[in-house]
Design a protein with these regions (language model features):
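Conserved mixed alpha/beta catalytic, RNA-binding, or beta-rich assembly cores of soluble enzyme
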Residues: 1-167
Length: 167
């Protein structure tokens, strides 16, 4: 299935400090999504260029496998949680999320099995431990792996609303 979707992400919603080295992506799945082709994302990333936040790439289905894995995993536990976004990890952002009463889960990459998708394994590990899909899943990175915060919600608007709470 092919299609287009507008995501409510722009420079007003994103501070350059939130953009990780790998860039940001945001995804939104169709109801009953089963695979990457059922998940809309950016064919590229949201990146920081010259201190400004820019979207590099079109928005379409089947494009962001990295963040789509988070969405598809979350939907196995709660079909209503159909959107996710990754942002740069910072301890201050996690503290602010706690102050804003967002639900938070953490996984440690040191315990990650070999030959698995970090996004699937990490998301599943946190969700199973908590018993629900949290607003935030984060890790502190590892050798060659950037620390990351993932924001999960029912829609891109829900995810961006949670992001705005962290600004």
């Amino acid at each position: 299935m092919q299609g287009k979707l507008h995501f409510p992400c722009n420079e007003e919603n994103l501070k350059p400090d939130f953009v990780p080295e790998v860039g940001i992506n945001i995804s939104y799945a169709l109801p009953d999504a089963k695979n990457f082709d059922d998940v809309c994302g950016i064919d590229g990333r949201i990146v920081k260029i010259g201190g400004k936040v820019k979207r590099m790439g079109d928005i379409d289905f089947g494009k962001s496998k990295h963040v789509a894995r988070i969405v598809l995993t979350a939907m196995k536990f709660d079909p209503g949680m159909r959107s996710a976004m990754n942002i740069r990890y910072s301890e201050n952002t996690v503290k602010k999320a706690k102050r804003k009463k967002l639900s938070i889960g953490f996984f440690d990459r040191k315990h990650e099995p070999k030959n698995v998708s970090t996004m699937e394994w990490g998301s599943k590990t946190v969700i199973e431990k908590l018993g629900f899909v949290p607003d935030i899943i984060y890790d502190k990175g590892g050798f060659g792996k950037e620390a990351m915060i993932r924001i999960i919600g029912k829609s891109p608007e829900d995810v961006v609303g949670k992001l705005k709470a962290l600004l």
